[in-house]
Amino acid sequence: MKTIKVSINSIDKVKQFVNDINRYSYDFDLVSGRYVIDAKSIMGIFSLDLSQPIDLNIHAEGAELDEVLKTLSVYEVE
């Protein structure tokens, strides 16, 4: 598992983010404070405070993880 910070602070970004991660069969969780939601759930994402970067837990390893990180690099923040 790897954790990165992502910024998905607009409706269009949320829709594109969900489309991007739904291409993979791995589990993705968004963590905001004490809330953990399935990152593939567009309704769940909209229940979070999107004005701040959110932790994304990626449950993949090896070459698969590298591919996922490349796809999600447009959302990643420091």
Language model segments and positions:
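Amphipathic alpha-helical interaction surfaces in cytosolic regulatory modules
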Residues: I11-D27, Y35-L50, E64
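Short glycine-/aliphatic-rich beta-strand segments at the starts of folded cytosolic domains
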Residues: M1-S7
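N-terminal intrinsically disordered, cationic/polar leader segments
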Residues: I4, V18, N22-Y24, D29, ...
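Short, well-ordered coil↔helix boundary/capping segments
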Residues: I8-I11, H59
